From Swiss-Prot:
Gene, per the UniProt record: HSP90AA1
Protein name: Heat shock protein HSP 90-alpha
Positions bound to ATP: 51, 93, 112, 138, 400
Species assigned in the record: Homo sapiens (Human)
Family indicated by similarity: Belongs to the heat shock protein 90 family.
Species lineage: Eukaryota, Metazoa, Chordata, Craniata, Vertebrata
UniProt cross-references to InterPro entries, sorted A to Z: HATPase_C_sf, Heat_shock_protein_90_CS, HSP90_C, Hsp90_fam, Hsp90_N, Ribosomal_Su5_D2-typ_SF
Amino acid sequence: MPEETQTQDQPMEEEEVETFAFQAEIAQLMSLIINTFYSNKEIFLRELISNSSDALDKIRYESLTDPSKLDSGKELHINLIPNKQDRTLTIVDTGIGMTKADLINNLGTIAKSGTKAFMEALQAGADISMIGQFGVGFYSAYLVAEKVTVITKHNDDEQYAWESSAGGSFTVRTDTGEPMGRGTKVILHLKEDQTEYLEERRIKEIVKKHSQFIGYPITLFVEKERDKEVSDDEAEEKEDKEEEKEKEEKESEDKPEIEDVGSDEEEEKKDGDKKKKKKIKEKYIDQEELNKTKPIWTRNPDDITNEEYGEFYKSLTNDWEDHLAVKHFSVEGQLEFRALLFVPRRAPFDLFENRKKKNNIKLYVRRVFIMDNCEELIPEYLNFIRGVVDSEDLPLNISREMLQQSKILKVIRKNLVKKCLELFTELAEDKENYKKFYEQFSKNIKLGIHEDSQNRKKLSELLRYYTSASGDEMVSLKDYCTRMKENQKHIYYITGETKDQVANSAFVERLRKHGLEVIYMIEPIDEYCVQQLKEFEGKTLVSVTKEGLELPEDEEEKKKQEEKKTKFENLCKIMKDILEKKVEKVVVSNRLVTSPCCIVTSTYGWTANMERIMKAQALRDNSTMGYMAAKKHLEINPDHSIIETLRQKAEADKNDKSVKDLVILLYETALLSSGFSLEDPQTHANRIYRMIKLGLGIDEDDPTADDTSAAVTEEMPPLEGDDDTSRMEEVD
């Protein structure tokens, strides 16, 4: 609940002042800004100008459908007014303004999603200049100000004043000062050691560096002096007025003030009479527009330097780093538009946060800003691209609904995607830069393969993966194809959690032995990507963890494999009977070398890795889990001593109870090594403990065993049993 206090100065009409506490995270952020030393404090001006520009964008957009919105002020501009006497810097805009509720919510009581993320980034050593990307740029004012006053007027509300010295609270009151019409005035009461930001030269320098491409005129108001000749009488009159003025309070700084310098005199004829003249100094307000630069996207790309692109990118995005790549182009013919697209150096912290509306590409119509969150302009997988699109053909007063139906927009979108892919392909020619790009945006490329069937082929050329033959370098699918063996028909891949895990997997044993390269796909999104990417350059992509793996074989090898199948046919049948519904079938493997067995999945089911990913989904559909979960096939290695001994044991006595124990243990171990999870890990653990006891020669019936182990052994019968029952089976 806000505390309410009353000021006593107004006998006629008492002004109500409400005090609010800052939301905890915002108070923490302000404390961090105020109490930490930052060298580049100047970014506060960029942030406040950027906020003003956004407010002007909003009122201009509203006025396209309702011109009366501008009745409260036709001109859209930003003014900067330094005042050395009062040590204040004022930023005024004629934007949309804020209602009382906006003031309270936006400036203090509701934390934006970026507040905490920005504080964490700061504490991890990030630059303060990143503040704008997290949506909390306003608070950078406290880098230089000890107190901030915000006066604002929205068309739908009265004029209000917000004020805070950052002591954990702020006040809001109705403002009875000079009416603004519409817009916002931010008054910074500067700290004693920050007066450099009142200097004309310094303000110009900052605006040129950070804000010269803002789409509204930024005017600097500076009080200056100039010489003026007046007659003696006039000078005396002015002097008297000056003295009177000093006695009274200054009413307005904008009125010229004149003081006597009194030495030069000359005679001159005026209207036929001789009058004495005096030179006096007159104070006046000089107005200078600081951003007269033509919109950069309308210029010829050949005339624009890399530095200019860099400056524009930073002013557009509030990024503190240079862009990684840029594409500047125009399309002419039936449809005309210009576009300037940038690839940032790093992905934003909330790249795939769906709730947040992206505002990465600004849409203009004939140089007039329309909107910056047009979802139809670019597909989601390219949501990291920043830039501007300026159309000649869209109507100025276009609404969101019309945009969704607009054929023009569909053509623009198609061209933007095409140019982005061109840009990535150009970037791929520079190995070092592409590596940086791929580290940040590989998920976007893979999401594109999943979603954009039209451009899937081009996107697949941009993929890079580690393979069993690539070492620490990532290679393209094209590189893989050039290294394929003569009789190799497929591209082999394995999905998993880490590079080491998949490299040591049982599934790649025989392929590596035969010198066949296997692609390691170790990101969760690879599972989705590869579902859509069935082939590359006519070669099918084959998972080495699924049934029916075909490896290049000669006739001799085929014959040997058939013999092994016949030899182990009986064991496969016995194992299937023991495992029942746990597996769909048991077969002799052609993919294992050192492992006794593995679990493979059916061609159209999920891999073990995909099953793990789906189980981790908080909002998963359990019915889907039922029919998509992998149908498991157990493959045994006919050349492994464990499997050979098990075959002999089973053929000697197919009712041997220990065979069942061993088969279940093999199956559960294969589940784990193949990337699946156990439904009942405790039972599996108990089996392993019993084997350890046997290995250590511990007699489970030993009366000297402590109570705890006795309690455990009740649940864990020994491996060897009598003729009637297998104790291992009892645990099941």
